[in-house]
């Protein structure tokens, strides 16, 4: 069993800090390490300046470890609370419903992991072998990896700065033994944080298919999605498309639809038309989605006749078409 206990890091750090890095630390692998404005007066300045620069020697190892994964997809959102992890969960269930597909779900939200709970395997732990870390299998063809499996209990908090989170992300990408997968879904934190920069850097040589972006219809969510799209374009990440979650509520009794989050500026579809990206579809609200995520059950199996189930399957067909897997 691999575990983080008492808030300690299980991995040897990439470097030894004299004190926690400052808020705007450029990172030890940056060309500006030890030279940036935030480095002045930092006790770690000399340590960072002395570190080797240039290509990360672990990138070829990450590429080799992920070589047997056919499709690698990042799941992104500009704002928290739009249902990104929920959608990742439903996407995992839907793809793995095809017994001919091998699916993996990697939870890289280090400080707020939720996939283990939503997939019904929160009490599991990671085991090591001579081939690396063995992922937790939800079903015979659905595997998952998360920091939650390394914590002593579900209430344990991860209070890490960037370097520790980045080291674990690299460990997940380099040392988890996925074997062969048709799909690896990578659930990321909301926003454009340190983790996103690291994920992009670590996967540069691994030929990811791109990113699926999740939003809700209201402008306050779309404002942050614009930033996410801008980040992807600057980072060279292919945008596979956008999904509008919680687009409406269909009453299970009268079948009438209500707009809970109103698309005051046209919603996700209008944004896609404006910015020239593919709109993969809208998924309506269904309270039973939350119930299934609480119990770790597949919403698509439990409620196949729900309008949300139909919409999710249509989105997945569009996604498979976008990655050339039809």
From Swiss-Prot:
Pfam families: ParA. InterPro entries: Mrp-like_CS, Mrp/NBP35_ATP-bd, NUBP1/Nbp35, P-loop_NTPase, YlxH/NBP35. Residues 16-26 have a biased composition (Basic and acidic residues). [4Fe-4S] cluster 2 binds at residues 251, 254. SUPFAM superfamilies: P-loop containing nucleoside triphosphate hydrolases. Binds 4 [4Fe-4S] clusters per heterotetramer. Contains two stable clusters in the N-termini of NBP35 and two labile, bridging clusters between subunits of the NBP35-CFD1 heterotetramer. One of its GO terms (cellular component) is cytosol. It is found in: Cytoplasm; Nucleus. Residues 1-38 are annotated as: Disordered. Its cofactor is [4Fe-4S] cluster. ATP binds at residues 78-85. [4Fe-4S] cluster 1 binds at residues 25, 39, 42, 48. Keywords: 4Fe-4S, ATP-binding, Cytoplasm, Iron, Iron-sulfur, Metal-binding, Nucleotide-binding, Nucleus. One of its GO terms (biological process) is iron-sulfur cluster assembly. GO terms for molecular function: 4 iron, 4 sulfur cluster binding; ATP binding; ATP-dependent FeS chaperone activity; metal ion binding. It comes from the Eukaryota. Disulfide bonds: none annotated. Belongs to the Mrp/NBP35 ATP-binding proteins family. NUBP1/NBP35 subfamily. Component of the cytosolic iron-sulfur (Fe/S) protein assembly (CIA) machinery. Required for maturation of extramitochondrial Fe-S proteins. The NBP35-CFD1 heterotetramer forms a Fe-S scaffold complex, mediating the de novo assembly of an Fe-S cluster and its transfer to target apoproteins. Required for biogenesis and export of both ribosomal subunits, which may reflect a role in assembly of the Fe/S clusters in RLI1, a protein which performs rRNA processing and ribosome export. PANTHER family: CYTOSOLIC FE-S CLUSTER ASSEMBLY FACTOR NUBP1 (PTHR23264:SF35), NUCLEOTIDE-BINDING PROTEIN NBP35 YEAST -RELATED (PTHR23264). Heterotetramer of 2 NBP35 and 2 CFD1 chains. This is Cytosolic Fe-S cluster assembly factor NBP35. It comes from Kluyveromyces lactis (strain ATCC 8585 / CBS 2359 / DSM 70799 / NBRC 1267 / NRRL Y-1140 / WM37) (Yeast). The gene is NBP35.
């Amino acid at each position: 069993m691999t575990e983080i206990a008492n808030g300690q890091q299980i991995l040897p750090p990439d470097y030894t800090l004299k004190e926690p890095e400052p808020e705007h630390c450029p990172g030890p692998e940056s060309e500006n390490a030890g030279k940036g404005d935030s480095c002045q007066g930092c006790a770690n300045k000399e340590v960072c300046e002395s570190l080797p620069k240039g290509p990360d020697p672990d990138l070829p190892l990450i590429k080799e470890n992920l070589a047997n994964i056919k499709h690698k997809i990042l799941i992104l959102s500009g704002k928290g609370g739009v249902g990104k992890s929920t959608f990742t969960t439903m996407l995992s269930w839907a793809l793995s419903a095809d017994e001919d597909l091998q699916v993996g779900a990697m939870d890289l939200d280090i400080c707020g992991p939720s996939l283990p709970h939503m997939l019904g395997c929160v009490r599991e732990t990671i085991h090591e072998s001579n081939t690396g870390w063995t992922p937790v299998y939800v079903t015979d063809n659905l595997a998952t990896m998360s920091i939650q499996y390394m914590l002593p209990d579900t209430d344990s908090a991860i209070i890490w700065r960037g370097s520790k989170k980045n080291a674990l992300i690299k460990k997940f990408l380099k040392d988890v033994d996925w074997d062969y997968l048709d799909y690896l879904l990578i659930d990321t934190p909301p926003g454009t944080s340190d983790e996103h920069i690291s994920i992009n850097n670590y996967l540069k040589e691994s030929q990811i298919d791109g990113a699926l972006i999740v939003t809700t219809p209201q402008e306050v969510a779309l404002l942050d999605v614009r930033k996410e799209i801008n980040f992807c374009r600057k980072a060279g990440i292919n945008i596979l498309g956008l999904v509008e979650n919680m687009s409406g509520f269909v009453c299970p009794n009268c079948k009438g639809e209500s707009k809970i989050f109103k698309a005051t500026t046209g919603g996700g579809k209008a944004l896609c038309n404006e910015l020239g990206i593919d709109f993969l579809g809208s998924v309506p609200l269904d309270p039973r989605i939350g119930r299934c995520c609480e119990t770790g059950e597949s919403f698509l199996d439990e409620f196949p006749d729900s309008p949300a189930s139909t919409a999710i399957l249509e989105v997945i067909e569009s996604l498979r078409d976008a990655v050339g897997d039809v």
